[in-house]
Amino acid sequence: LKYSSPVNIVLLHKNLRISDNSALYHGCNADKSLIIYAYDKDYWSNNGKSERQFQFCLDSLGELDEKLNKLNRDLFIFEGDLDELALWIDKNFPQSKIFLNQSTDIHYHRNLKAKFISKFEDSGRLYEFEDFGIQTKNHNRDDWSSNWHRIMTQKILPPPQINHSSKIKPKDLLDFKAFKKKLSLVDPKNNSFQLGGEDKAKKLLSSFLGKRMDGYSIKMSSPVEAEHSCSRLSPHISFGTISLRTIFQEVQKNMDSSIFKKDLYSFKKRLHWHCHFIQKLETEPELEFKSMHPMCDSLREEGNDELIEKWIAGETGFPFLDACMVFLKEKGWINFRMRAMIMSFASYNLWQPWQKTSPRLAELFVDYEPGIHICQVQMQSGVTGINLPRIYSVSVSYTHLRAHETDRH
């Protein structure tokens, strides 16, 4: 069925929330609006993407669908890539306007999105909103920080005000509930992974700013204490179940009255760094495959699949490294310092090319954020040409390890 009247189409990707969502807020401000998430099967099997990340995405979409239902809207799933979606929109909604938030992702998605944006931008039908303060055009390092701060201090948008009763139900799209039923997913055996959803993100932020952040600036480096002392918001930030602006403003609000000022300041700095690294990948997308310093690509050219498999499985024979890998596989998360150690071990001790180990490690992270992961992989592999190489000692004795074991490790 072809809709000749104007329709606003909101395209979701890494902004799976109802509050402070510019694309959703402005896109739903019309008599007729359609909210779509594009499920591209190939995307979820591409460079570093994995089933555990998709499960978090599904959790988040499910909660968002429930919130939209209360506003008399449904979340629809388009099955296909962005090229196919563009053709579908042109065929069925030739007068539509498209609303989406800016996001930086892996090469596979970036190329498809660039073509999608170009197609609709040229006709003045596309509206893309800033989310992380990433400059997509005319990148200027001199005003980057001031621009980031401007975005983080803007007014937080409420949920969209949808007062219209008219609903669009395209026959060739599945609503979220039907899509999830079609997937026939078996409940994951591992219930140790974090669950997605905006409500869970807000609860984590509240508990972190309340008591959990006590000692954060020190405890975040500990493989024992970090699990409970870190914010644990990383997957929620990556999938956009809470806006970075919301987090930033809550931190600012607590700054004067909190007794954890040092910890708050340390956390606030990391919000800035988060976007700094994503900007790096946005500006230099080739970093996904090539070393920052071109001469370093010839350092480690041949990979040893057997070594890489033992590393991923936590079967290297180095107790501390193996314990960290088993923990990561079980939880889908480990603290930043241990991530650095794991990657450094693969690049220095095993002398494996980061291009082979990077996606394998990324698959284990529920919170995989390409911009951060890829930049950190290169830093820990010593291929940036500007960062001091760090080699971590993993020769921890069994006696020392046993003293700090969790119940499982």
Question: Where does each model-flagged region fall?
Answer:
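Residue-level signal for inorganic ion chemistry
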Residues: 27, 98, 240
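Short alpha-helical segments and helix-capping/turn motifs at coil-helix boundaries
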Residues: 17-24, 84-85, 111-115, 254, ...
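Glycine/tryptophan-enriched, flexible segments
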Residues: 143-294, 401-402
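Beta-rich, aromatic/charged-enriched effector core domains that present basic-aromatic interfaces
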Residues: 81-203, 377-380, 398
